[in-house]
């Protein structure tokens, strides 16, 4: 039987397609098995497992971002590094030999220093921690495994993706490509709360299985902006281009300082609960320098030592998205064999050799006065008598959203033009 396999990352949503090497290049499926999230008695052990893989995931996040930036000098960037890493780590469970090593090393794991079991345990606890219910912060992740009704996958692979990556499994008829596409897109749309639609626009009828994975985030600022203070202001895309954007304004106390090393203003804004947004505004002509210099060590220093100061802050409201073909991006990080005829995915199915034909990632972000969810709040702050500086994010800037509990970079991006969707 011809085989192929698909996989997606979402709201970060993405899609990876596995095809036979012999080839040129609500849900309506039936649940095969429901996965129970493992119950852990020791929260401290969970966090420790997450934290052990956090440095590697951070290195991967910044390396991947730089690859995207090199291909995208004038466009907005938005992606979820942790979602991409999770998807490929999950796929690695079905790979062997050089294909296997390339994926984990491309995700910045040194297999001589960190046992593979420790890596997967870290992801297992990361997913469990991120999916803990919180009244103030909506952060949910999910994995869907869509299996062709005639396919015979390796039982251990099925067991591992369910137990370690909390994947749900569904039986599906991939020969009916339109119905299969609808099932996968419905799963993605539902999981992303309608933010990601029509992720899959075409599907190979020889597909054997699809791994779809998503993360959805809704957060409220600890210190929201007043809607009444939002005004239309200029945003300077480049020396020749200026656009009008709705600019949020607030006079108050912020974790804000000018970092001479990065030649940038650095703003940290906390969401209610465990997430923090970093906004980094480079000085004129220093954008590329900032992109090259930003590392996990610098990010950690910003968290360790905050600089509360008064300012009149101007931050644009925006909705941006990014769609990426990961084949070339990950190829530059050393992940190549899984996309080639040399791929060894015999841990997925032994029926016919497979390779990864497509890997797509799509992400969407909205920033507004309340965060990403409307809610009322009143902030009273004492402001120093001295005249506070005006800090305007009215030219290209970088940002990332970081989960303080798991120490994971959830999202990362660059705003070149807020009017560019």
From Swiss-Prot:
Renumbered residue ranges of the record's region RCL: 376-395
Cellular location(s): Secreted
GO cellular component: extracellular space
Site (Reactive bond): 385-386
Signal sequence residues: 1-24
Protein name (database record): Alpha-1-antitrypsin
Predominant location: secreted
Family: Belongs to the serpin family.
Gene3D superfamilies: Alpha-1-antitrypsin, domain 1, Antithrombin, subunit I, domain 2, Serpins superfamily
Assembly information from the UniProt record: Interacts with CELA2A. Interacts with ERGIC3 and LMAN1/ERGIC53. Interacts with PRSS1/Trypsin.
Written domain comment of the UniProt record: The reactive center loop (RCL) extends out from the body of the protein and directs binding to the target protease. The protease cleaves the serpin at the reactive site within the RCL, establishing a covalent linkage between the carboxyl group of the serpin reactive site and the serine hydroxyl of the protease. The resulting inactive serpin-protease complex is highly stable.
GO molecular function: serine-type endopeptidase inhibitor activity
Residues bearing glycans: 73, 110
Biological role stated in the UniProt entry: Inhibitor of serine proteases. Its primary target is elastase, but it also has a moderate affinity for plasmin and thrombin.
InterPro entries, per database record: Serpin_CS (IPR023795), Serpin_dom (IPR023796), Serpin_fam (IPR000215), Serpin_sf (IPR036186), Serpin_sf_1 (IPR042178), Serpin_sf_2 (IPR042185)
Sites of Phosphoserine modification: 386
Alphabetic keyword roster: Glycoprotein, Phosphoprotein, Protease inhibitor, Secreted, Serine protease inhibitor, Signal
